[in-house]
């Protein structure tokens, strides 16, 4: 308290200094500008010697006065700058925007409270406390449905997390798709002092499905009406946000506005910044009833406890039923109904200053809300055109949005010091696991990677696929980084059926991928490709984690474990479905091997049959995969036998065997200790053998590896001795773990390794 008083005394002293110095200066200059009781101009143009009274001495005096005046003005400018900084650091700054008034934006009865806020913010009374306590939890509700909205929510949440200083509790009204995506995202994001609760949007459909709605948000655009019924009964207040919102300030400032509600005010809203509700946008335009310009519901402050007491549910239903008799449907979803209720009950609304919802719609007048960047609090992209909307300041707004769109979300994992938080079991387990490896161990970074939790965004693009009813469907599974993006279109042309891909990208690269995909006719025509973004963290490429993510999120009973550099033969999908049935994969432990070949040519006339492939093999256009570098990796496939085989044949496991296989979706995961280059597939095939999988080579299947520049990890493997030493150490530890897990039968792997 004493510190606050001292701060205010400094603030008052600085204010008096700024006022006092100019006053004394101008008195001094004014007195000095008289000679013999007559005024003398200080203007350089008027001070030319045109009178006998003019002397060299008086000219020097005037020049010195002008120099002194400029010095005083510069001192005054510096003092003003210091004063503005002091205002920015003062506690009153965090109570809301009390220092600015916009009479045209304030609602009835609001100007008094705003003026009171200004007085309170600038008074020297030391007993006043901040409107939002340091560790007070701020509650935010968001309606989210579908794949695209899930991406938008991430950008919104980033902007909120970037500025926040308080614990947050997000209440997400989500459909099954959004829940799966966002639950995984927040679970792997592990942001401290953030709690997430989900509410099933599909269960709420019956509450609003009777309302015809023409808005592009569909039925989900009406669900804000039922928040009083949906959210916990003990929740008193909540900030409700659209998914197309971007914050440019601490959300606690908006939360503090709740303390300014008076009487029966239960809704905090910003006036609509277009002429939509005035009905003059085009001829015969007939909007829903609204108070003046109406209000925009992209940002809402809801006093839930009072709304429940007022029987809000009954209030909005009766209003909607009455208006629908003449309007037939809503045009702006819940916003039309909120405005119709407010038209009948204007006392319900507290009008927020318009900078809390700067609307960038097609007919907006939002530029009247702000004079400079510091006025902006919340930006609302409430046009179907989103970033393509026309606005004279749209470039600035777009850059602000892109800042959060591409911002590294891992940097938002910072702790809120001084605020107690609930114990997070996952976080505690992670810290325990990370503390186990010895930091002095030369392979510490390798061991640490095994426990690193990577932020994961499932189904980054729209996904839609219904598996075949005969239970023979196969999904191609692969992983990639940004430098292999060019392979996607080629793979999609060769494999027209379901694909599950894990992409290892930064936040900025994820947006580059999105733009690339949206600009590709081939990729946009496919809805059966699941793109799962695993965000970058650490120095190694987590190849086996990526494979596990892609494997885990398939909707078919079988999967083809491939790599992004391989193109499968045309028609492989149908051939695999037949083979799955013929070899009874559903009831047996089999791994079907797809023989792998490679070409050194970037432009290849892809063989359309086995006969064509054999011809190219004989001519030296194709080779068996890694025949000159790592023969042992695919030698057990027995390519000599494959050339003449017409029926599937069984092969035995051998050391360093790493074929590409088709297996059931319940097969073991890849071992996460192997990152970067080396032993990642070998270890998996070894475990399949330990679990008594039978390896069967398909006689009429093949895949071809396309050439590319060496990866960063293989370069490190070849050039870094310590990298190779650590890989060998991890390999030995894996073999020991196999022996402990599978017993005597696993000893053959140690023997085979010693003999190889």
UniProtKB/Swiss-Prot annotation:
InterPro entries: Glyco_trans_8, Nucleotide-diphossugar_trans, Xyl/GlcA_transferase
Transmembrane regions: 11-31
Free-text remark on how the cofactor is bound: Binds 2 Mn(2+) ions per subunit. The xylosyltransferase part binds one Mn(2+) and the beta-1,3-glucuronyltransferase part binds one Mn(2+).
Necessary cofactors: Mn(2+)
Record-listed Mn(2+) 1 binding positions: 242, 244
Recorded family membership: In the C-terminal section; belongs to the glycosyltransferase 49 family.
Region spans: Glucuronyltransferase activity: 414-756
Pfam families: Glyco_transf_49, Glyco_transf_8
Topological domains annotated Lumenal: 32-756
Location(s), subcellular: Golgi apparatus membrane
Ranges for region Disordered: 42-63, 81-109
Membrane topology: Single-pass type II membrane protein
Entry superkingdom: Eukaryota
Cytoplasmic topological segments: 1-10
Stretches the record annotates as Xylosyltransferase activity: 138-413
Function: Bifunctional glycosyltransferase with both alpha-1,3-xylosyltransferase and beta-1,3-glucuronyltransferase activities involved in the maturation of alpha-dystroglycan (DAG1) by glycosylation leading to DAG1 binding to laminin G-like domain-containing extracellular proteins with high affinity. Elongates the glucuronyl-beta-1,4-xylose-beta disaccharide primer structure initiated by B4GAT1 by adding repeating units [-3-Xylose-alpha-1,3-GlcA-beta-1-] to produce a heteropolysaccharide.
Pathway(s) the chain acts in: Protein modification; protein glycosylation
EC number: 2.4.-.-, 2.4.2.-, 2.4.1.-
Catalytic activity field: 3-O-[beta-D-GlcA-(1->3)-beta-D-Xyl-(1->4)-Rib-ol-P-Rib-ol-P-3-beta-D-GalNAc-(1->3)-beta-D-GlcNAc-(1->4)-(O-6-P-alpha-D-Man)]-Thr-[protein] + UDP-alpha-D-xylose = 3-O-[alpha-D-Xyl-(1->3)-beta-D-GlcA-(1->4)-beta-D-Xyl-(1->4)-Rib-ol-P-Rib-ol-P-3-beta-D-GalNAc-(1->3)-beta-D-GlcNAc-(1->4)-(O-6-P-alpha-D-Man)]-Thr-[protein] + UDP + H(+); 3-O-{(1->[3)-alpha-D-Xyl-(1->3)-beta-D-GlcA-(1->](n)-4)-beta-D-Xyl-(1->4)-Rib-ol-P-Rib-ol-P-3-beta-D-GalNAc-(1->3)-beta-D-GlcNAc-(1->4)-O-6-P-alpha-D-Man}-L-Thr-[protein] + UDP-alpha-D-glucuronate = 3-O-{beta-D-GlcA-(1->[3)-alpha-D-Xyl-(1->3)-beta-D-GlcA-(1->](n)-4)-beta-D-Xyl-(1->4)-Rib-ol-P-Rib-ol-P-3-beta-D-GalNAc-(1->3)-beta-D-GlcNAc-(1->4)-O-6-P-alpha-D-Man}-L-Thr-[protein] + UDP + H(+); 3-O-{beta-D-GlcA-(1->[3)-alpha-D-Xyl-(1->3)-beta-D-GlcA-(1->](n)-4)-beta-D-Xyl-(1->4)-Rib-ol-P-Rib-ol-P-3-beta-D-GalNAc-(1->3)-beta-D-GlcNAc-(1->4)-O-6-P-alpha-D-Man}-L-Thr-[protein] + UDP-alpha-D-xylose = 3-O-{(1->[3)-alpha-D-Xyl-(1->3)-beta-D-GlcA-(1->](n+1)-4)-beta-D-Xyl-(1->4)-Rib-ol-P-Rib-ol-P-3-beta-D-GalNAc-(1->3)-beta-D-GlcNAc-(1->4)-O-6-P-alpha-D-Man}-L-Thr-[protein] + UDP + H(+)
Gene Ontology molecular function: glucuronosyltransferase activity; hexosyltransferase activity; manganese ion binding; xylosyltransferase activity
Protein name listed in UniProt: Xylosyl- and glucuronyltransferase LARGE1
Biological processes, Gene Ontology terms: protein glycosylation; protein O-linked mannosylation; skeletal muscle organ development; skeletal muscle tissue regeneration
Residues bearing carbohydrate: 97, 122, 148, 272
Coiled-coil region: 55-90
Keywords, comma-separated and alphabetical: Coiled coil, Glycoprotein, Glycosyltransferase, Golgi apparatus, Manganese, Membrane, Metal-binding, Multifunctional enzyme, Signal-anchor, Transferase, Transmembrane, Transmembrane helix
């Amino acid at each position: 308290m004493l510190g606050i008083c001292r701060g205010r005394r400094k603030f008052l002293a600085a204010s008096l200094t700024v006022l006092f110095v100019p006053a004394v200066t101008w008195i001094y200059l004014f007195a000095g500008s008289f000679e013999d009781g007559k005024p003398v101009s200080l203007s350089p143009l008027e001070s030319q010697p045109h009178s006998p009274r003019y002397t060299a001495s008086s000219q020097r005096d005037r020049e010195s006065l002008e120099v002194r005046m400029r010095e005083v003005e510069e001192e005054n400018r510096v003092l003003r700058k210091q004063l503005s900084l002091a205002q920015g650091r003062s506690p009153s700054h965090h109570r809301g925007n009390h220092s600015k008034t916009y009479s045209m934006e304030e609602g009835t009865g609001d100007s008094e409270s705003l003026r009171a806020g200004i007085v309170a913010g600038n008074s020297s009374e030391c007993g006043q406390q901040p409107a939002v306590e340091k560790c007070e939890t701020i509650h935010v509700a968001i309606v989210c449905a579908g794949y695209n909205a899930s991406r938008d929510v991430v950008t919104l949440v980033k902007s909120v997390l970037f500025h926040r200083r308080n614990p947050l509790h997000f209440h997400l009204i989500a459909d099954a798709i959004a829940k799966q995506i966002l639950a995984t995202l927040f679970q792997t994001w592990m942001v401290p002092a953030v709690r997430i609760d989900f509410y099933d949007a599909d269960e709420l459909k019956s509450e609003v499905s009777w309302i015809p709605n023409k808005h592009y948000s569909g039925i989900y655009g009406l669900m804000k009406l039922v928040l009083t019924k949906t959210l916990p009964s003990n929740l008193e207040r909540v900030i409700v946000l659209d998914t197309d919102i971007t914050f440019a300030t601490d959300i606690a400032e908006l939360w503090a506005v709740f303390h300014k509600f008076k009487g029966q005010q239960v809704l905090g809203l910003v006036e609509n910044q277009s002429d939509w509700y005035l009905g003059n946008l085009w001829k015969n335009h007939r909007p829903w009833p609204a108070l003046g310009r109406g209000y925009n519901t992209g940002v809402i402050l809801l006093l839930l406890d009072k709304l429940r007491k007022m029987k809000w549910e009954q209030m909005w239903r009766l209003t909607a039923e009455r208006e629908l008799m003449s309007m037939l449907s809503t045009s702006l979803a819940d916003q039309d109904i909120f405005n119709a209720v407010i038209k009948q009950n204007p006392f319900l609304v507290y009008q927020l200053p318009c900078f809390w919802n700067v609307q960038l719609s097609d007919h907006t007048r939002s530029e009247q809300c702000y004079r400079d960047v510091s006025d902006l609090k919340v930006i609302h992209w409430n046009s179907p055109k989103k970033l393509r909307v026309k606005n004279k300041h749209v470039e600035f707004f777009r850059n602000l949005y892109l800042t959060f769109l591409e911002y590294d979300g891992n940097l938002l994992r910072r702790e809120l010091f001084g605020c107690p938080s609930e114990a997070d079991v996952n976080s505690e387990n992670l810290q325990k696991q990370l503390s186990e490896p010895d930091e002095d161990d030369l392979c510490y970074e390798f061991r640490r990677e095994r426990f690193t939790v990577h932020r994961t965004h499932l189904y980054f693009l729209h996904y839609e696929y219904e598996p075949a009813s005969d239970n023979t469907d196969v999904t191609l599974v692969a992983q990639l980084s940004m430098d292999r993006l060019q392979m996607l279109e080629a793979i999609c042309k060769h494999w027209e059926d379901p694909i599950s891909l894990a992409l290892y990208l930064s936040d900025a690269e994820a947006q580059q991928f999105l733009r690339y995909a949206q600009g590709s006719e081939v990729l946009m025509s496919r809805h059966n490709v699941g793109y799962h973004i695993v965000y970058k963290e650490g120095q190694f490429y987590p190849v086996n984690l990526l494979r596990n993510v892609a494997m885990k999120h398939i909707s078919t009973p079988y999967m083809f474990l491939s790599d992004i550099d391989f193109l499968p033969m045309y028609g492989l999908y149908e051939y695999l479905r037949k083979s799955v049935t013929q070899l009874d994969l559903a009831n047996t432990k089999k791994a079907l091997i797809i023989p792998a070949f490679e070409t050194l040519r970037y432009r290849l006339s892809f063989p359309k049959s086995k006969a064509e492939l054999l011809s190219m093999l004989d001519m030296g256009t194709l080779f068996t995969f890694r025949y000159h570098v790592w023969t042992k990796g695919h030698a057990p496939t027995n390519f000599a036998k494959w050339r003449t085989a017409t029926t599937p044949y069984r092969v035995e496991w051998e050391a360093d065997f790493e074929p590409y296989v088709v297996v059931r979706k319940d097969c073991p995961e890849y071992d996460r200790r192997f990152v970067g280059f080396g032993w990642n597939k070998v270890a998996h095939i070894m475990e399949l053998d330990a679990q008594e999988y039978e390896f069967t080579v398909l006689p009429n299947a093949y895949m071809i590896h396309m050439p590319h520049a060496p990866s960063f990890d293989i370069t490190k493997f070849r050039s870094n001795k310590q990298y190779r030493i650590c890989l060998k150490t991890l390999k030995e530890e894996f073999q020991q773990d196999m022996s402990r897990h599978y017993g005597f039968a696993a000893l053959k792997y140690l023997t085979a390794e010693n003999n190889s």
